[in-house]
Amino acid sequence: MAIPSRPIREEIRSIAPYNAGLTLEEVRAKYHVDEVAKLSSNENPLGPSPALRRLFPDIGELARLYPDPQGRALCARLAASFDVENNQVILGNGSEDLIAVICRSVVRAGDTVVTLYPSFPLHEDYTTLMGGKVDRVTVTPDLSVDMDALLAAIARKPRMLMFSNPMNPVGSWLTPLQLAKVVAALDPETLIVVDEAYAEYAAGDDYPSAAEVLKVTGLNWVVLRTFSKAYGLAGLRIGYGIVSDGSLCDFFNRARTPFNTNAIAQVSALAAFDDTYHLNRSVELALVERERMKKELATMGYRIAPSKCNFLFFDARTEATPVAEALLRRGVIVKPWKQPRFETYIRVSIGSPVENDHFIHALKEVEAVG
């Protein structure tokens, strides 16, 4: 199978990879020395303030030294899990950082990027920042993917196809058959980026792992994941991408900042990834509560999109912003959607049972007041 050319901007090709030097671990392993004086990166020998050490007693060298710019330990663990090479994994300051990196690497002025709509706004925003044109494929009236419109958009040979699966904010998803049709229709020069921020919640045989589907295609592709949702590390800002091959991943690495994921985030993500018990508990809670919340909202007469995420997207039957404001006054924070054509919709996260009860009670109060 012929390897398609890389859809990379010439400006990125001309940038040499950043040389961050060797880490302490690399020097010890390569040169077999125990004591190493790291005097290459202008770090403070005293380390962080004692106030920080009181907050985090074991922070030590994690805060004093620059992190591994490649996040090698975490990348190796992720690569093994996805059965890819280590150099096919890239880390980001949240997966949204990688959306920006990919757009900086690929999108030229005038290029077309196909997205699903409504979707995560940054898919469109970073395209626009690079001078690209967004080709929206709007969901059907039942809030599922419009496959005819999507395949028609793909047939126009865009520079990139970027979408979330499951979709944020709707919650619906492409099935294995639908994803296979998308892949079969793609031009070899089109980069496909599947944002799987909510994949851990997408239980069932009707949800495909994009990496497993794409690995055998020979296409240029990226699958994005995050530690912010099911792994509970939103405040640490760390996500990752699985890339079709090391060569393409190398170009993306040139477009990111060298130390875009901090050392604490890297070690925390590695620990979280290996704690499958906690992950399973988190997902199970979300799925059970999602179904309970869905029934409650349906009983109240609301129209709810199908969801494989840790949230529900429902039609408030009136402008959503005033409803959200009324909920705020009752101590509940939800997200009214403001993209055109969906201004009556609210996205509500699945919280703890107590939080979810608080929301339902508050929504009933808002309804009663009118």
Curated annotation (Swiss-Prot):
| Catalytic activity, reaction form | L-histidinol phosphate + 2-oxoglutarate = 3-(imidazol-4-yl)-2-oxopropyl phosphate + L-glutamate
Q: What does the UniProt keyword field contain? A: Amino-acid biosynthesis, Aminotransferase, Histidine biosynthesis, Plasmid, Pyridoxal phosphate, Transferase
Q: In which pathway does it act?
A: Amino-acid biosynthesis; L-histidine biosynthesis; L-histidine from 5-phospho-alpha-D-ribose 1-diphosphate: step 7/9
The answer to whether the entry has keyword Membrane is no
Per UniProt, the enzyme's principal EC class comes to transferase
Positions where N6-(pyridoxal phosphate)lysine occurs in the chain: 229
| An annotated GO BP | L-histidine biosynthetic process
Protein name, UniProt field: Histidinol-phosphate aminotransferase 3
Source taxonomy lineage?
Answer: Bacteria, Pseudomonadati, Pseudomonadota, Alphaproteobacteria, Hyphomicrobiales
